[in-house]
């Protein structure tokens, strides 16, 4: 609608009468109003037209004809005008419709797309680094081209949107020092329902030593203040997956090959396996000098099997003695055309295929002149392995500057193909990916670049670079060790612009590169923040608060905080970061999902102050987490000792106890949720739960209603940890919450050992305990601990540990558990000592050695002497049950045991530790080991070492039911019928056992000597816990209903406390304590409440006149002092019940206090006088049981496989393939399917057809082909294998030729296999329109077997064409939904 203005001016547009220029109340930035015409103006029916005659009356006279003629004329004119208007209107309508349809067909507006908001104006600020931009109310900008500015502030309704187009062809880079989004401001790149298609890059530039910092945010940042909106949504892509097939170093299963030598005279020959690219034979034939060498070459070629690849290169000269028969053999079998005319010192190279004819032969010759051939004679052929990997074989020969050179290469051609677990069709050529280490060193992670690969399936990619390390892509020994593969590239990039090297005050003594990157910081009360599928590169600074993504003191960011759309980060790629990945600081309820953190400094996923709760970390990947400088816990050893600004005085930090804790997931409060995450390589720990005594940092002073130490654990489900040095999972410790001072000079926030996790209902210690459930943890290739878990009630279940220095260690406390009555349990779990993941030397792997199982070289967790343990007993009480142990075999250098104990243990070990329903595989040589003096164990003489013990409840460890296992030299627990197991350094005894906790006052460096009356020649000397302390403590394990005497290596203590620990009601022992003859005593007993330190029911012990009186009334409170021997005798008898796992009775800890008065300073050792007077003949209180026979029913975990995709079903398949010698010995051949053995002893081939869509598995057919019938297998393969079937084949004995190569190719191999003269053949294939990554062919040379092979095959996959009757239950998704609900 418009009105006519002055003549010659354009029409002036007017506002519609029903509209206005302001936003509607429901306007949402980024939501676009659909394109449609404005409504017509309202019809004002009440308006009146005034007759012109009323203003200027006039009279005109016409004849009737004249009057009629103008009337008719006007009527015709109106009709004409009506037609013209109609025509124009119609034409305009169709033109407009065509335009609209044309526009719609090109780029249909979408109200979900922020860049299609019709109110936006295109904006091009140009390239001006001095321009300060303020986008304010009324400024609604669409950035359409590259720009460089100084800074951008968006405020008061201002809006900045990155332009996009339908085909994603825009490529917009915005360079700025910072972007500050203030109240009412918004920055949008894409939206959740309209993801950005083009490439958008925000580059944050500037140096740390130029210009002043902005308040709060500093430099090089995107900052979101209260009321600000940041919405970044890139193209949705698979963030990370895992390998589905092992990626070998160099891309080939047997590695690449390279050889070069000068003056290697004659014909140098290599024979290469056409199926695997393995160099089989390496020979040199001096056909220049010797005719016999020519004959030997002829026979050598005659013996080669058809299809073998042969490479030949001349060294120096080869023709003088080259016989015609040999030349003919080369022509006939390799198709050479140049060998016949080869001359003196001519360079010649050939690559051909035996019996492949001239079409498969590539050869080259160069003439020799003046000691040179003027270049290389180069021959090359390209081939494919059975896995479909393309490789090349190269041979070359030349003379250069008078030197003869010849050589060979076998390597990858046209890129390496990766087989992945998930659909990665959204990954594109040019993208960067990272493949995680599957060895001890996190530095074996590799960055690779994707190539175009039209032949790849949806789960395959091809990479440009040659892998340097082995990356496992299999389930090995029942444990998922498949390497994580993460996509680093995103189409929205936020990056820091970096200098070439470190400068200014940026810790250049530790880093030789620039670490002053950009950062994104979000402040409290933001309006909306959602980041998805964004790449953050070169972000973070080695300065506090400057992290790639930092939610800073935001409080509750979910519905509890009033957000209808809770804040989230999803699908981010944070890599090459200079300070952390995602920092959650004083923020609760944040969802962090599908995010990768790679190659970062300091804790990666970082919960900071100990107040962060309800945050959800779902399916995130962190790897290559390196030390940083910010906090003591970030630092490595050198940083720790050098950075001393935060300590008091001249204190030098101790790296192992103050620092060295950098972790991929740093969880500072237990009430957070971790589901489906992978911590795939950190300098110290993968996942670390720590417990703050009080809020720290900027949250200091907040009053938490619930103490973290007492708060129940959030969801922990299906997380994996590997390639970490200190621990995969670490649940223990806290940080120091006080400033450095003279009394404690350590730095604020350094590691602190005072925290104890003891979860209770509502975080109230007076309410019932709540067990922390660690469900489905996979921990492998961690140098020290797979998992170290300290706390109250904790249950580890459905978990797997492999190739760790120590699989799992539970800890509670040194003397008494902090959480009285608590215990720890591991159940339904698998422990593997040395798996078939042999590792790969390199990438900072420090330790190599020989394996105990098969004596093959392998990487080791520590040095060659380090004792490997599966489950490590420490403190207690713990319960190990329903678990399986495999492959713990010592070597001459080291011990390896399924169950072991903490080494150099000065603390207590309770006899209430117990084991039941455990299973040991055939390759377990040491079920348990108690240590011996030597490397790592040192003298093995600390108090905890000597008192190591556990209860074998059902005999599943020892074969003796209801017995206790202790160290062999411990005579406090023995009786005559105990069974010694020398190789365990153990003794197995029946009986009942408890502990006496002895504490003395003012007696530093005093050792206690305790002797059982039955074994006076075998006393136990205890140094005491904290021996240098004023009040040392001792805690021997004792057999009940026996007598003991206690002596000292110095003057007797004046005050001694004896606590009855783990005594049930009426349990007793008699003790005699050594004192000088002139000592007087006051002995009392009471019940100590350890929670508050109160003492109740105090009674005095009365003196007895004789030993006989004392013995007749053992239940009364009496003592007897034998001044002749110096022994004060009394009975320690429990008078109250003990509940559950409580160390003390339900009334408190029964404590006897002895006050001794004497002026003697003599050493109080009464051994010589006490015995033989008080000697007793050794006897058993409880009869030793008979040894069990038969298999342990119900022992071990019922799970055969532990994977990171537990919603999938995997079928364990095991082949036992003996060679000729084993067959002659009578060993059977076996195919085992899910534990069911199919055995055969006749020569031939066994074929099993398994339904790929049935769970549980179903064998459709079992078919045996004897040697005479093997020729019929081809026909069977062609006609009888139904679709959607798994094909399992194993041969036995000599089969000269299997005619099934073509059939195996149809069942999943990339080409027909070479099956001539094989000792054994094992094949796993699939019948269907899909080639799974698990299809494999194994062969061995003639007369050799393949040993034991194990594979785990997925069942009921959609790719197989299975029609599932019901949807797969995803417990992880159920738990995610549960966590998202705010209570």
Swiss-Prot record:
Any one biological process term the GO annotation gives: hyaluronan catabolic process
pH dependence: Optimum pH is 6-7.
Domain of life where this protein originates: Eukaryota
Family assignment from sequence similarity: Belongs to the CEMIP family.
Transmembrane stretches, start-end: 83-103
Natural source organism: Mus musculus
A GO MF term: carbohydrate binding
Effect of residue 265 to A/C: Strongly decreased hyaluronidase activity
InterPro entries per the UniProt record, alphabetical: CEMIP/CEMIP2 (IPR052252), CEMIP_beta-hel_dom (IPR055401), CEMIP_X (IPR055400), G8_domain (IPR019316), ILEI/PANDER_dom (IPR039477), Pectin_lyase_fold/virulence (IPR011050), TMEM2_PANDER-like (IPR039473)
Effect of residue 248 to N: Slight suppression of hyaluronidase activity. Hyaluronidase activity is abolished
Taxonomic lineage: Eukaryota, Metazoa, Chordata, Craniata, Vertebrata
Catalytic activity field: Random hydrolysis of (1->4)-linkages between N-acetyl-beta-D-glucosamine and D-glucuronate residues in hyaluronate
Enzyme class, UniProt record, top EC level: hydrolase
Name of the protein: Cell surface hyaluronidase
Listed PANTHER family: CELL SURFACE HYALURONIDASE, TRANSMEMBRANE PROTEIN 2-RELATED
Keyword Metal-binding tagged: no
Stretches forming PbH1 repeats: 669-691, 711-733, 791-812
GG-type lectin domain mapped to chain residues: 255-412, 1208-1366
Stretches for region Disordered: 1-76
Domain G8 positions: 121-245
Residues bearing attached sugar chains per UniProt: 292, 914, 1234
EC number annotated for this UniProt entry: 3.2.1.35
Effect on the protein of changing residue 286 to N: Strongly decreased hyaluronidase activity
All ranges on the Extracellular side of the membrane: 104-1383
Membrane topology per record: Single-pass type II membrane protein
């Amino acid at each position: 609608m418009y009105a006519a203005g002055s003549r010659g001016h354009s029409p002036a547009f007017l506002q519609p009468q029903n509209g206005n220029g302001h936003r509607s109340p429901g306007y949402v930035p980024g939501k676009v109003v659909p394109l449609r015409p404005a409504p017509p103006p309202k019809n004002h029916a009440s308006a009146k037209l005034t007759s012109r005659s009323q203003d200027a009356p006039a009279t005109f006279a016409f004849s009737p004809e004249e009057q009629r003629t103008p009337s008719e004329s006007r009527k015709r004119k109106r009709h004409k005008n009506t037609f013209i208007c109609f025509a124009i209107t119609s034409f305009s309508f169709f033109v407009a419709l065509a335009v609209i349809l044309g526009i719609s067909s090109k780029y249909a507006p979408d109200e979900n797309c922020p860049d299609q908001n019709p109110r936006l104006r295109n904006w091009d600020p140009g390239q001006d680094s001095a321009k300060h931009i303020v986008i304010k109310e009324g400024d609604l900008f669409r950035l359409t081209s590259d720009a460089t500015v100084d800074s951008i502030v968006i405020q008061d309704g201002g809006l900045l949107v990155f332009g996009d187009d339908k085909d994603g062809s825009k490529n917009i880079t915005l360079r700025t020092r910072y972007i500050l989004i203030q109240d009412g401001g918004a920055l949008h790149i894409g939206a959740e329902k309209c993801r950005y298609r083009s490439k958008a890059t925000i580059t944050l530039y500037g140096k740390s030593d130029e210009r002043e910092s902005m308040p709060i945010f500093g430099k090089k940042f995107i900052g979101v203040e209260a009321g600000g909106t940041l919405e970044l949504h890139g193209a949705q892509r698979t963030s990370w997956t895992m390998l589905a097939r092992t990626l070998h170093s160099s891309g080939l299963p047997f590695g690449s090959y390279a050889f070069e030598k000068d003056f290697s005279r004659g014909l140098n020959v290599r024979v290469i396996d056409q199926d695997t690219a393995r160099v089989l034979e390496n020979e040199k034939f001096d056909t220049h000098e010797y005719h016999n060498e020519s004959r030997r070459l002829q026979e050598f070629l005659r013996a080669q099997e058809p299809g073998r690849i042969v490479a030949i290169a001349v060294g120096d000269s080869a023709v003088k003695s080259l016989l015609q028969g040999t030349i003919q053999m080369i022509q006939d079998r390799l198709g050479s055309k140049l060998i016949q005319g080869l001359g003196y010192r001519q360079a010649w190279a050939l690559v051909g295929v035996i019996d492949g004819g001239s079409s498969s032969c590539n050869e080259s010759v160069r003439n020799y002149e003046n000691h040179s051939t003027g270049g290389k004679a180069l021959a090359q052929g390209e081939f494919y392995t059975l896995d479909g990997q393309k490789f090349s074989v190269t041979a070359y020969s030349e003379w250069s500057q008078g030197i003869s050179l010849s050589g060979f290469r076998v390597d990858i051609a046209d890129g390496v193909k990766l087989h992945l677990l998930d659909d990665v069709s959204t990954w594109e050529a040019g993208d960067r990916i990272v493949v995680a280490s599957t060895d001890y060193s996190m530095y074996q992670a590799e960055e690779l670049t994707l190539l175009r690969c039209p032949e790849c399936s949806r789960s395959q990619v091809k990479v440009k670079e040659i892998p340097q390390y082995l990356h496992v892509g299999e389930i090995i020994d029942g444990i998922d060790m498949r390497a994580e593969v993460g996509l680093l590239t995103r189409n929205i990039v936020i990056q820091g612009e970096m200098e070439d090297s470190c400068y200014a005050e940026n810790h250049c003594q530790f880093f030789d590169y620039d670490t002053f990157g950009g950062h994104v910081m979000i402040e409290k009360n933001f309006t909306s923040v959602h980041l998805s599928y964004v790449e953050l590169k070169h972000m973070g600074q080695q300065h506090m608060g400057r992290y790639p993504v930092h939610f800073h003191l935001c409080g509750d960011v979910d519905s509890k905080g009033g957000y209808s759309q809770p804040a989230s980060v999803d699908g981010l790629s944070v890599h090459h970061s200079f300070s952390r990945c995602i920092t959650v600081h004083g923020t609760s309820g944040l969802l962090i999902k599908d995010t990768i953190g790679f190659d970062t400094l300091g804790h990666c996923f970082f919960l900071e102050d100990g107040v962060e709760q309800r945050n959800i970390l779902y399916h995130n990947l962190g790897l290559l987490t390196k030390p940083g400088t910010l906090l003591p816990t970030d630092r490595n050893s050198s940083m720790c000792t050098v950075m001393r600004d935060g300590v008091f005085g001249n204190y030098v930090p101790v790296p192992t106890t103050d620092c060295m804790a950098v972790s991929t997931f740093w969880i500072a409060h237990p009430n957070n949720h971790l589901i489906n995450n992978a911590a795939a390589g950190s300098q110290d720990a993968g996942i670390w739960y720590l417990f703050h005594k009080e809020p720290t940092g900027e949250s200091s002073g907040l009053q938490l209603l619930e103490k973290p130490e007492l708060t129940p654990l959030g969801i922990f489900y299906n997380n994996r940890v590997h390639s970490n040095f200190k621990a995969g999972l670490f649940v223990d410790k806290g940080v120091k919450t006080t400033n450095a001072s003279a009394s404690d000079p350590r730095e604020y926030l350094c590691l602190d050992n005072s925290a104890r996790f003891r979860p209770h209902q509502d975080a109230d210690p007076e309410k019932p305990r709540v067990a922390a459930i660690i469900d489905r943890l996979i921990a492998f290739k961690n140098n020290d601990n797979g998992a170290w878990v300290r706390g109250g009630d904790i249950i580890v279940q459905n978990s797997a540990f492999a190739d760790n220095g120590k699989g799992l260690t539970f800890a509670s406390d040194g003397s008494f558990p902090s959480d009285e009555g608590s215990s720890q349990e591991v159940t339904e779990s698998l422990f593997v000592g040395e798996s078939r993941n042999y590792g790969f030397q390199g990438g900072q792997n420090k330790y190599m050695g020989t394996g105990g199982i098969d004596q093959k070289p392998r990487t080791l967790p520590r040095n060659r002497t380090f004792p490997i343990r599966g489950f490590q007993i420490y403190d207690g009480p713990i319960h190990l049950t329903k678990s399986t142990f495999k492959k713990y075999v010592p070597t001459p250098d080291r011990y390896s045991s399924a169950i072991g104990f903490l080494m150099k243990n000065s603390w207590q070990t309770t006899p209430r530790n117990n084991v039941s329903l455990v299973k040991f595989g055939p390759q377990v040589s040491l079920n348990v080991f108690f240590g011996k003096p030597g490397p790592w164990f040192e003298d093995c003489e600390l108090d905890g070492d000597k008192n190591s013990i556990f209860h074998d409840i059902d005999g599943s460890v020892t074969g003796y039911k209801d017995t206790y296992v202790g160290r062999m030299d411990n005579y406090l627990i023995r009786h005559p019928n105990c069974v010694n197991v020398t190789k365990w350094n153990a003794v197995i005894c029946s009986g009942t056992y408890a502990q006496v906790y002895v504490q003395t006052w003012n007696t530093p460096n005093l050792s206690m000597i305790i002797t059982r009356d039955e074994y006076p020649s075998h006393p136990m000397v205890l140094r005491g816990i904290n021996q240098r302390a004023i009040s040392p403590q001792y805690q021997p394990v004792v057999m009940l209903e026996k007598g003991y005497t206690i002596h000292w290596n110095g003057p007797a203590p004046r005050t001694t406390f004896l606590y009855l620990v783990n005594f049930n009601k009426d349990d007793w022992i008699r003790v005699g304590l050594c004192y000088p003859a002139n000592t007087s005593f006051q002995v009392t007993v009471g019940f100590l409440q350890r929670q508050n330190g109160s003492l109740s029911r105090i009674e005095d012990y009365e003196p007895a006149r004789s030993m006989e009186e004392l013995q007749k009334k053992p239940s009364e409170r009496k003592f007897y002092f034998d001044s002749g021997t110096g022994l004060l005798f009394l009975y320690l008898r429990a008078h109250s019940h003990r509940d559950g796992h409580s160390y003390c009775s339900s009334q408190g800890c029964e404590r006897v206090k002895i006050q001794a008065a004497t002026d003697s300073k003599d050493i109080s050792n009464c051994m010589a006088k006490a015995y033989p007077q008080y000697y007793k003949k050794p006897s058993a209180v409880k009869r030793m049981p008979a040894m069990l026979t038969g298999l342990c029913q119900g022992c071990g975990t019922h799970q055969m496989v532990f994977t990171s995709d537990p919603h999938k079903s995997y079928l364990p398949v095991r082949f036992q393939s003996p060679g000729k010698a084993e067959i002659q010995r009578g060993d059977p051949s076996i195919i085992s399917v899910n534990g069911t053995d199919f055995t055969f002893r006749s020569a031939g081939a066994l074929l099993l057809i398994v339904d790929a869509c049935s769970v549980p598995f179903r064998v459709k057919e079992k078919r045996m082909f004897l040697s005479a019938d093997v020729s019929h297998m081809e026909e069977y393969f062609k006609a009888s294998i139904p679709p959607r079937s798994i094909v399992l084949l194993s041969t036995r004995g000599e089969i000269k030729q299997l005619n099934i190569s073509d059939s195996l190719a149809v069942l999943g191999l990339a080409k027909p296999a070479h099956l001539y003269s094989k000792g054994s053949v094992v094949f796993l294939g699939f019948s269907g329109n899909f080639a799974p990554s698990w299809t494999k062919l194994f062969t061995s040379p003639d007369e050799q077997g393949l040993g034991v092979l194990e594979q785990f095959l997925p069942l009921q996959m959609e790719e197989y064409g299975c029609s599932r009757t019901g949807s797969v239950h995803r417990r992880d998704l159920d738990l995610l939904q549960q966590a998202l609900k705010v209570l």
